[in-house]
Amino acid sequence: MSSRRRAYPQPQYAATPAVPAADPQLQQFQPQQAQGQAQQAQGYGAGSPAYGVDQVNQQFQNMNVGGGVAGQPMANQYSGQYQPPPSQANPQAPYQAPGADSFGSQFAQHPQYAQPGMVGGAAALPLNQLYTTDLSRELPPSITDLSLPPPPIVLPANSVVVPTSEDSNAPPEYFRSTLNVLPANNSLLKKSKLPLALVVRPYNTLHIDSENIPVTSDTIISRCRRCRGYINPFVTLTEQGRRWRCNFCNLQNDIPSAFDYDELTGTAKNKFERVELNHSVVEFVAPKEYMARTPQPIVYTFIIDVSIDAVNSGLTSTITRTILESLDRIPNDNKTARVAFIGVDSNLHYFKFNEGLDGTDLLIVSDIDEPFLPSPDGLLINLNENRSTIEKLLIDFPTYFEGTANDRFALGPALRAGHKMISNIGGKLICFTATLPNIGEGKLTLRDEASHSGKPKESQMLLSNADKFYKSFAVECNSAQVTVDLFLTSAKYQDVASLANLPRFTAGQTHFYPAWSCAKAEDVTKLSREVSEHLSMDIALEAVLRVRGSTGIRMSSFYGNFFNRSSDLCSFPTFPRDQSYCIEMSIEETIHKSVVYFQAAVLHSTCFGERRIRVMNLAIPTSTKLDDIFASADQLAVANYFTHRSVEKAFSSSLPDARDYLVKSIVDILNVYKKELVAGNVSGSSPLQLSTNLRMLPLLLFSLTKHLALRQERVPSDHRAAALNLLSSLPIPHLIKYIYPTVYSLHNMGDECGLPEQIVQVDEETGEEETVNSTEILLPEPLNDTKASWENYGLYLIDNSTELFLWVSGDVVPGLVYDLFGTDNLYSVPTGKTELPEFSFEESEFNYKVRQIIGKIREQKDSVTWKNLYVVIGGSSNEPIEISQQRDLMALRMWALSCLVEDKTASEPGYREFLTSLKSKITQ
């Protein structure tokens, strides 16, 4: 290919004038006050002054707002929508008492000590101001809001022990609430129709070394004697700093002497430098009192399908090769990791390792009704000590089952055997299957999909657990500290709905690969990469999660993959690093304090044998005003909560009930807002008004009703069950993209897109500015999920969190096709699951940039998912007849276009029609 940089015809790449840009549209906002307060109403007519970004920013600058989510300075946290407040109300602002030289000498004058247990000055503190958006005038919706942080948390300036601490309140990536101002009583919460819940994500990366969480290793842990809360940045020091008052229950506790004096070195210490008093997210190295037993080694038992379907599809050989190549990635710093291997068809094939010898013995157990371990030792072995023998087994493993004709798969007995093998230690049972379990305990059969798919009883007949074994066995595993992970690969029915119970109650995950085949290089790449990443994850072991809140607040419901051992204790045999959890709360008594507190603690053993406690702290102000509640609602966290509730209804009731629940929730919220917060509740005013910080919520919940998991169209039950499972476990950034896919326009992207982002650095000595390239690839701005934002000659990339679609419009410019694919003939371009040809920057700048963008999107430090790329050629009046008759291409087009959730389909409305239908449901 010749070296060139093609200049594409500008008229063809100009933005369509009729399509508004997807920028924040704030011109319809007006500052809103509670109903009954004097306010000058502004109309929406042509004569009304536009209320733009500058005006909104000015309003935020004029507000005496403090606090916010910690982790970085306020100016960096809330760029775009929320501006930094004046420093006098900022709890993160540096504080120095008059005449004080250190924290140790200033505590006597600190307001916290003057009024123990009270939050001074909070009554006069203004909270986030309410702005109203007319949803019907906000079309297309401003999707840039989906990347904004939640509304800032406004706290009194003296609410923390160490005023100079910049991250005393938990970052939303770890710990966030649906409401960043809590109702002071339950009646106000019910009146708002907004959910009160916490979203907890203790780990944000797959590997410990990519985190920057402070660790206190002296094993000195100070906890409240009454409620057992951990000392944190929001406690109050009393009695000249010798005691601390719990911010949860108000009990006074002694401060450990080790906070002020190091017995080992004989030197004085400054308690105000303690990690737990300065940081919202900390990790304690736990003493022996926190251990029921010595931390156990990490254990992986691989249960591998060796039936005819698995062997013929290449699953058996691919998995053993992947495990072999991933042995160095298994967390094993302390050289204690153990592994075992079981092959499964109608028999159980154990592999015994002989100590001191190179070979292994294959031991076959045909009694699957009462499976037993054929040897007391040699089945579960140390990875480091037996490395060469393990490698040889993995190389030879597929040869043991070549030419098999056995079509049986005894998954239940294999799970029982694996459980017996590791139940005294705990660990993981990782199952790789290509066959429906069809023999022995847990045997499953085909369901009548044709009769029930898309019908009212679909949930009951196709999505329910078909055998109680999968729930009861999962509970047994949880008690024995055993997690089950599933990797399901088959072109046939596998009953994902039943099998997914195993990971759901053992803190595992179900990975689904429909129609997987080793004949497709892309299939092999995806499975291998995801398995390898999964094995490399620095999981925590023998973990429990407890979330506590201030007096008057109760944790009522828990959502996610774990087992709820008691009313407030969630059990995790192993704690994954790529999932999040939702906890619903109830207000049981009136809250009289101006700030409430939440604390999530994960007691766990690290994969390198250390017992630790990860503690996350969150402080949120309270209010008795409904407008404060709405102005500080976190729309992404609210959407996360409604997602969990809709999944629960899909399983327990029906899919129509789940969709109706989502629509009713939006209607209820709009009704409350119109009745209580629209100024004067003027008759004839638009019923579709909502606070600006919630304006994406109707779009997200509408998109959820059209999602593969909930849509009313016929969907294969395995696909639907797998989608429901993802909805209930994905962290918020991935969940939002899974509900509302991200679309990028590639044909008219800026010259800087696809290249490293340029950063201006200032030399501290000379003051000179220097432009350097960062490691971050710049992505194009996203478009709305609608064909109306597309051009019929464009090139678009769709990211739905699990796959990537490269849409090549049927009337695309031939030069662009050549630069991207190396051919002028559009219809010679390979479609479906594929990869782009690789050209250097000199050969084709456009190809290089697009591949860089795809590579950047695939980079995920917090997920094991590898996104396959599907190339889709769009329709055209000029396409050959044989192309338009290709069923696979037609299906691929429909799949990709289903990501454009704002558009109308044959059976479902578009977002504009949805908003119109809401008007009739809103009380006039």
Curated annotation (Swiss-Prot):
GO biological process per UniProt: COPII-coated vesicle cargo loading; intracellular protein transport
Subunit relationships: The COPII coat is composed of at least 5 proteins: the SEC23/24 complex, the SEC13/31 complex, and the protein SAR1. Golgi apparatus membrane; Peripheral membrane protein; Cytoplasmic side.
Region (Zinc finger-like): 224-249
Function: Component of the coat protein complex II (COPII) which promotes the formation of transport vesicles from the endoplasmic reticulum (ER). The coat has two main functions, the physical deformation of the endoplasmic reticulum membrane into vesicles and the selection of cargo molecules.
Gene Ontology molecular functions: SNARE binding; zinc ion binding
Protein name: Protein transport protein SEC24
Family (UniProt): Belongs to the SEC23/SEC24 family. SEC24 subfamily.
InterPro entries, per database record: ADF-H/Gelsolin-like_dom_sf (IPR029006), Gelsolin-like_dom_sf (IPR036180), Sec23/24_helical_dom (IPR006900), Sec23/24_helical_dom_sf (IPR036175), Sec23/24_trunk_dom (IPR006896), Sec23_24_beta_S (IPR012990), SEC23_SEC24_subfamily (IPR050550), vWFA_dom_sf (IPR036465)
Membrane-protein topology: Peripheral membrane protein
Matches recorded under PANTHER family: SEC24-RELATED PROTEIN (PTHR13803), SECRETORY 24AB, ISOFORM A (PTHR13803:SF39)
UniProt keyword terms in alphabetical order: Cytoplasm, Cytoplasmic vesicle, Endoplasmic reticulum, ER-Golgi transport, Golgi apparatus, Membrane, Metal-binding, Protein transport, Transport, Zinc
Species: Debaryomyces hansenii (strain ATCC 36239 / CBS 767 / BCRC 21394 / JCM 1990 / NBRC 0083 / IGC 2968) (Yeast)
